[in-house]
Amino acid sequence: MKIAFLIHSPEVNSCRYRVLQYVPYLKEHGVEVSIHLYPRTWPEKWSLYGTLRQYDLVHLHRRLFPPAEFWALRRKARRIVYDIDDALMYRSSGKKNPRSLSRRVKFAFMMKRVDFVVAGNRFLESEVLSYNRHVAVLPTSLDLSGYSCKEDSLQKEGITIGWLGSGSTLKYLRDLMPTLERLFRKFPHFRLKIVCDLFLESSVVPVIKKEWSLDEEEKDLKSFDIGVMPLSDDLWSRGKCGLKILQYFGVGLPVICTPVGINRDIVEDGVNGYWARDEKEWEERLLKLMQEEGLRKAMGIRGRRTLEQGYSLAVNAPRLLNILQGVAAREGRSP
């Protein structure tokens, strides 16, 4: 089986976790893999799309194509699998009107014409089902060889509440900052560590700022005592696939999250982490975890187990291979 994967950039987290980390497994199981960046100019597009007939399957990662361009690609590809891990059919959080006609038109046009869709969560699956019944949920997964549980905390002053992410999601942490500042006035024994390419300031809470790098990501995660994933409850956020939580679980951290979208599936409230639905719950649950080291450790162990059982590369790579083989072998004409 020959597959062409079209991606935005190997530097993008989504590409690494949804596509590139699966490539070694696919090759080990006899799949010929070719990786291509999405072309920018029409000559580049015609050049690439003209080669697609040689592949059994073309895998597109999270791009919404203009209908005319997608139709040109569709005519050249035997089979198309589309991978989606964000609510691309909506505008991002904070927009006055989350609905976008242009995005919806592109999304609907593509979904009606691809052979199969791999969705990162059940919300995205439900969006796809309006147009195409050939869809399966494959959660974002971690290669556990790159993550080990942090050792017991050494004696140190205070607790580190950690947040790791991209600048585009820093707004969710900004919304949590007043709660952290209010909590610090009551319990001034913690610091906030932000691992990102952008940062926040606080005149109340001590903030440690660390530029994100792939090489130091695991080390930075292990410097946290508690991992947080605040979100807003909107259509865009419901499409998120919980990568932060999985990374926290990877090093055995307890997690507090807003129970939106897949967060509700990954985190079992009170078992491997806590849900925080409002400011009061954020305060109460952060305080409880900061004061109880044994609880932090127990939740972290359960979180790691959750990761191993349902969100690991070892579990989900065979599932992806099975999906791709099934689509490539399907009889009948493409849409």
Model-based region annotation:
Residues 10-25, 143-149, 154-223:
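Conserved catalytic-core segment of nucleotide-activated headgroup transferases in glycan assembly
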Residues 46-53, 68, 72-76, 88, ...:
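Membrane-proximal helix-turn-helix segments that form the acceptor-binding/catalytic region
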Residues 58, 73-91:
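Active-site proximal beta-strand in glycosyltransferases
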Residues 123, 141:
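Carbohydrate-associated surface elements
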Residues 171, 215-250, 257-265:
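Nucleotide-sugar-dependent
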Residues 269-280, 288-294:
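Conserved acidic donor-binding segment of nucleotide-sugar-dependent glycosyltransferases
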Residues 288, 295-310, 316-319:
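A short, well-ordered alpha-helix in the C-terminal region of glycosyltransferases
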Residues 313-335:
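C-terminal alpha-helical cap of glycosyltransferases
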